[in-house]
Regions:
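Residue-level signal for pocket-adjacent positions within structured domains
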Residues: 21, 58, 86, 91
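Noncatalytic, solvent-exposed loop/strand surfaces
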Residues: 6, 50-52, 87-89
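Short, conserved beta-strand/beta-arch hydrophobic-aromatic motifs that form part
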Residues: 26, 32-78, 82
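Amphipathic alpha-helical interface surfaces
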Residues: 7, 11, 55, 59-62, ...
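Well-ordered alpha/beta subsegment
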Residues: 89-119
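Short, intrinsically disordered, mixed-charge
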Residues: 13, 57-69, 107-115
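N-terminal first-folded block
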Residues: 2-38
Length: 119
């Protein structure tokens, strides 16, 4: 099921501490961006709509310490099924409660997106 607009708007509110978030439809979900830079996505990988935050080598451990899931999906490579992953982690459960709780995670995600842009 495609992610709904209300959830996308709510996620943008949660991420508002880093600036005005724009939600755009993307591959059946949503891309959340600031100034054209995508730093979060919303997707349903089979267990409902979820907010996924951009992570990098510097921030990955912080997400994993809270047992956040890595964005992983089934795909094919050379005609064989494989699990593929992207540099996004599910938002911590507690952070989904308020923009104040989400603020440090929003900064991490935006920082990861900025770092990836410089590469």
């Amino acid at each position: 099921m495609a992610a709904n607009r209300d959830f996308a708007d709510y996620c943008c509110e949660l991420l508002s501490s880093v600036g005005p978030c724009l939600a755009k439809r993307m591959f059946g979900g949503w891309g959340l961006s600031l100034g054209g830079l995508t730093f979060a996505i919303i997707a349903d990988l089979g267990d409902g709509d979820k907010l996924w935050l951009k992570a990098d080598a510097d921030s990955r451990a912080q997400f994993e310490a809270l047992q956040c899931q890595r964005f992983t999906y089934s795909g094919q490579k050379n005609g064989k099924p494989v699990n593929m992953s992207m540099g996004y982690y599910s938002a911590p459960v507690d952070a989904m409660e308020s923009s104040l709780a989400m603020a440090p995670w929003a900064r991490l995600a935006l920082g990861s997106a900025l770092a990836a842009q410089r590469l």
